[in-house]
Design a protein with these regions (language model features):
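Catalytic domains that recognize anionic headgroups
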Residues: 1-218
């Protein structure tokens, strides 16, 4: 467990405008920010000022220890929301897109097959572990500059998605053409395949299959 919180990364964020002329490239700047987020242990992921929830705030017939862990998780989510918000604010005044996605979720004593388990494991695939947030932000200046891309992003709201298409989506969004580019795996493409079956496979071979379905009505 780290003694540092994710906010320690904020002073190191750069926009392309902050780069010296010697380091600027015509294609702009691509950055990856890897957060600890709400990884266990949850109580170590946020400062005391974000300890808003306690065991007494958690309903149900769980044990005091279980309620305390859930409260710590909720606090870590609250803090993570603040950090992600600060990242977005940092880039809101530049020509930027921010994409936030989690690599996995957590189960907190709510998996009927493992009612005493909290966390994520390679051999269990409850819905709360495999369903993750996927957020896209585009700054106002970039929306004005590339309105077509912004319209494509808006059209993608609510589409069924799986994180394995993120690399293809990023490459296409950045205007990079490769022999491996597949528009049906580009979330923002008009040719995106919303009917693709999405399968998650655990380390022991267990599967969680999300059946294909049409894009939601708007």
């Amino acid at each position: 467990d780290s003694l540092f919180y994710d906010e320690c990364l904020l002073p190191h964020l750069l926009t392309v405008e902050q780069l010296s002329p010697r380091h600027r490239r015509p294609g702009g700047l691509f950055s990856v920010v890897h957060l600890m987020g709400s990884h266990a242990g949850y109580a170590n992921r946020y400062p005391a000022s974000f300890a808003r929830f306690a065991a007494k705030d958690i309903p149900g017939s769980l044990s005091p220890g279980q309620k305390e862990k859930i409260a710590a998780y909720d606090n870590s989510v609250l803090y993570n929301d603040r950090v992600v918000s600060d990242i977005i604010k940092h880039y809101s005044h530049s020509r930027s897109i921010v994409i936030y996605v989690s690599d996995h979720g957590e189960t907190l004593f709510d998996d009927p097959a493992h009612p005493d388990f909290a966390g994520h494991a390679g051999n269990t695939l409850p819905a709360n572990v495999v369903r993750v947030p996927f957020l896209v932000y585009m700054s106002p200046s970039l929306r004005r500059e590339v309105p077509k891309l912004w319209e494509q992003i808006l059209r993608a709201q609510g589409e069924p998605v799986m994180t394995d298409l993120l690399p293809n989506t990023l490459v296409s969004m950045l205007g990079i053409q490769t022999p491996y580019t597949r528009p049906e795996l580009d979330l923002f493409s008009p040719r995106y395949n919303a009917n693709r079956r999405r399968t998650v496979i655990a380390v022991d071979g267990a599967k969680q299959v999300f059946p294909p379905h049409s894009a939601p009505s708007r």
